[in-house]
């Protein structure tokens, strides 16, 4: 028996060891079971946690989300700690089975919003800790199931508001921490029923005022001992931009000397300690109406806008009183805006009278009267005006175009109502309307057209005669949907008042306007064409300049190798001067020839070189060879020699002979190299001129010239 109990004990221990998650510590303190998994590096909630766990600690891990199955069937769980994780998402109804949960710690995570069903099923939750998250939004019904809360901590978040209606129902709440948020308003009466509340912390928000509440009258601090009485309500509101006027006078009258709250406005009290300012300096400025409409006259059926602006401290609220003495509120025919503007969408004769604008704040009120005159439309005589047509009521466009069958005629046929008005033509800015309805309404004065756009709810009214069958609506926006209604303004035969009746409504959309796009495209194309044409012209000029430069460079290069033109060649066969006769030679040869012309004593060498050239090139074409050389040298030597003989004095015979011999020896070597160069060149390298052409036809004359050159050379040697 003892062995059996021992084995049973071992089996129980083994089962317990298997149920406890890895890395966690399970404490069995009968009848409670605690599972401690803090600081274990967990990425998710362990799936094998004992469902009978009473206390579960999962703090300081890396859990990112909570799923529905993580805490399923844990009905005994009382305390759940999920602090200091990275939780950013909680599945709806994730805590639905935790009906006995008393404390839920979700502080220091990454939650950004609280949805409707996140805390569903937590009807016994007393402590909800959500501080140090990134909350920006709390759903209006998120706290509906946690009405038994005693402590709610939402501090250190980014909340601008919270569901105050849900807070108002938490009658068991005793601690509310809202510090370090961006809350700018607390509705009046929020804490009226929270009699158990002992601490409210709204430090470091954007509150300019606190609403007076009977709960705050318990906010007292014992000046002598500094101990808070159990019945005392602790209020912390430091770090807010308080506007110290008469609205905070109730708070100043509390005995609080230990806090250091300061005023942010008005300018006279900026930076001063709240509790040190005398009560008589908490002042308010009574309202003063600064701008208003003096008098207005409008045609019956048109729109009337009355304006009233006031200033004061605090900002005054503006109300309107009708000529009958009734408070005007938002209705189908009238709108009251927050800035003090009153809009009467469709005026009637009974709207004539004095409208009163009332601006009020805690310091007082101011009034201003404005006269509205409705110009009555002329009545048309009609024998059937005793027939009573029922007034369908309001004629504002929101009722006639947005409410389905209400926009139809009195028989309720919407399709027939739309068929009564047809858009014949619609462009980007205009629409042509055609009226197909029968004018059987007695006493019709005129028709009123009213329309607005999808993006602009401002009504536009047009009045047209009752005989009109078409109407052109101008100044419309392109690509915009319009709701348009036609109303008949007629005389009520029984009441003798002007009544309106919806004849028909239609919805249409204007065309898209592409004119500006095409215009911009045409401008773009025109500019592009100008740029292209200009580019072509510039490119053409550049190409022309480049061509000229290339041609000039080529001509320059050719000029360096250009053949020398030798003119005025005299024939030695007949002694006559040949006009226009020339022989072309390479530049090197022309330079040598010119040098020989300058020096008369070189004629002999030139003749020898010409003879040598003719002998070495005898294998080439005889016409080319003979045309290249002889005439050039025959023209220079005799002429220059004759000039020397005339101008120069005749020296002795021996020096002259030695000089000629030296010159002959020097020029012979030079011209021999020239002759060899000419002989080694191909025949095509020598350009044929007119003289060479004549040389082909007269070979005997050339031979005669050569013989004469030889004779002349011998004569010079003998001298």
Swiss-Prot record:
Cysteines paired by S-S bonds: 308-357
Annotated LRR repeat ranges: 52-73, 76-97, 100-121, 124-145, 148-169, 172-193, 196-217
Domain of life, per lineage: Eukaryota
GO biological process: negative regulation of inflammatory response; negative regulation of macrophage activation; regulation of presynapse assembly; synaptic membrane adhesion
Signal peptide: 1-17
Ranges in the topological domain labelled Extracellular: 18-529
Pfam families, per the entry: I-set (PF07679), LRR_8 (PF13855)
Subcellular location: Membrane
Glycosites: 339, 452
GO cellular component assignments: cell surface; GABA-ergic synapse; glutamatergic synapse; postsynaptic density membrane
Subunit-level organization: Can form heteromeric complexes with LRFN2, LRFN3 and LFRN4. Weakly interacts with LRFN1. Able to form homomeric complexes across cell junctions, between adjacent cells. Does not interact with DLG1, DLG2, DLG3, nor with DLG4.
Domains as described in the record: Lacks a cytoplasmic PDZ-binding motif, which has been implicated in function of related LRFN proteins.
This protein's name: Leucine-rich repeat and fibronectin type-III domain-containing protein 5
């Amino acid at each position: 028996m003892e062995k059996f109990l021992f084995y049973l004990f071992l089996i129980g221990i083994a089962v317990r060891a298997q149920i406890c998650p890895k890395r966690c510590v399970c404490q069995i303190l009968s009848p409670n079971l605690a599972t401690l998994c803090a600081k274990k590096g967990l990425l998710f909630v362990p799936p094998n946690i004992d469902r009978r766990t009473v206390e579960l600690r999962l703090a300081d891990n890396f859990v990112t989300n909570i799923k529905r199955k993580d805490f399923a069937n844990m009905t005994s769980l009382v305390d759940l700690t999920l602090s200091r994780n990275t939780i950013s998402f909680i599945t709806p109804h994730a805590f639905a089975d935790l009906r006995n949960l008393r404390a839920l710690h979700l502080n220091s995570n990454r939650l950004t919003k609280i949805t409707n069903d996140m805390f569903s099923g937590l009807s016994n939750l007393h402590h909800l800790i959500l501080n140090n998250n990134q909350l920006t939004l709390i759903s209006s019904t998120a706290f509906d199931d946690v009405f038994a809360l005693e402590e709610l901590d939402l501090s250190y978040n980014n909340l601008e508001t919270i569901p105050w209606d849900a807070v108002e129902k938490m009658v068991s709440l005793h601690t509310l921490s809202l510090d370090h948020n961006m809350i700018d308003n607390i509705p009046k009466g929020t804490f009226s029923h929270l009699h158990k509340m002992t601490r409210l912390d709204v430090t470091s928000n954007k509150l300019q005022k606190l609403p007076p509440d009977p709960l705050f009258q318990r906010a007292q601090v014992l000046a002598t001992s500094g101990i808070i009485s159990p019945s005392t309500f602790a209020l912390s509101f430091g770090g807010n931009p308080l506007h110290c006027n008469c609205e905070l006078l109730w708070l100043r009258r509390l005995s609080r000397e230990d806090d250091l709250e300061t005023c942010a406005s008005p300018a006279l009290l900026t930076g001063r300690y709240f509790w040190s300012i005398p009560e008589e300096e908490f002042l308010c400025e009574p309202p003063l109406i600064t701008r208003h409409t003096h008098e207005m006259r409008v045609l019956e059926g048109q729109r009337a806008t009355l304006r009233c602006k006031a200033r004061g401290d605090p900002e005054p609220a503006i109300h309107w009183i009708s000529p009958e003495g009734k408070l005007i509120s938002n209705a189908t025919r009238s709108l009251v805006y927050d800035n003090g503007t009153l809009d009467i969408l469709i005026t009637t004769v009974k709207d004539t009278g004095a409208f009163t604008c009332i601006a009020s704040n805690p310091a007082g009120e101011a009034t201003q009267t404005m006269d509205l005159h409705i110009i009555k439309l002329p009545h048309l005589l009609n024998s059937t005006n005793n027939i009573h047509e029922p007034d369908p009521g309001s004629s504002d466009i929101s009722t006639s175009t947005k409410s389905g069958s209400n926009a139809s005629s009195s028989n309720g046929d919407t399709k027939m109502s739309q068929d009564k008005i047809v858009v014949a033509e619609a462009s980007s800015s205009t629409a042509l309307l055609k009226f197909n309805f029968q004018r059987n309404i007695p006493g019709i004065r005129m028709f009123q057209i009213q329309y607005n756009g999808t993006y602009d709810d401002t009504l536009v009214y047009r009045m047209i005669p009752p005989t009109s069958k078409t109407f052109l609506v101008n100044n419309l926006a392109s690509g915009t949907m319009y709701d348009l209604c036609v109303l008949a303004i007629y005389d009520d035969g029984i009441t003798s008042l002007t009544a309106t009746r919806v004849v028909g409504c239609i919805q249409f959309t204007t065309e898209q306007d592409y004119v500006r796009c095409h215009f911009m495209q045409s401008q773009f194309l025109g500019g592009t064409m100008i740029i292209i044409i200009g580019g072509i012209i510039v490119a053409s000029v550049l190409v022309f300049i480049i061509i000229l430069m290339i041609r000039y460079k080529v001509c320059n290069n050719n000029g360096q190798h250009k053949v020398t033109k030798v003119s005025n060649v005299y024939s030695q066969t007949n002694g006559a001067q040949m006009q226009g006769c020339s022989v072309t030679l390479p530049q090197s040869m022309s330079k040598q020839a010119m040098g020989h012309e300058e020096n008369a004593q070189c004629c002999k060498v030139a003749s020898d070189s010409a003879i040598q050239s003719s002998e070495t090139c005898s294998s080439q074409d005889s016409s080319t060879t003979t045309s290249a050389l002889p005439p050039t040298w025959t023209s220079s030597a005799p002429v220059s020699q004759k000039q020397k003989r005339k101008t120069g004095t005749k020296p002795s015979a021996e020096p002259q002979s030695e000089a000629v011999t030296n010159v002959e020896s020097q020029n012979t070597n030079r011209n021999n190299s020239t002759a060899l160069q000419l002989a080694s060149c191909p025949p095509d390298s020598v350009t044929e001129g007119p003289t060479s052409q004549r040389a082909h036809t007269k070979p005997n004359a050339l031979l005669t010239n050569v013989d004469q050159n030889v004779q002349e050379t011998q004569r010079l040697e003998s001298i």
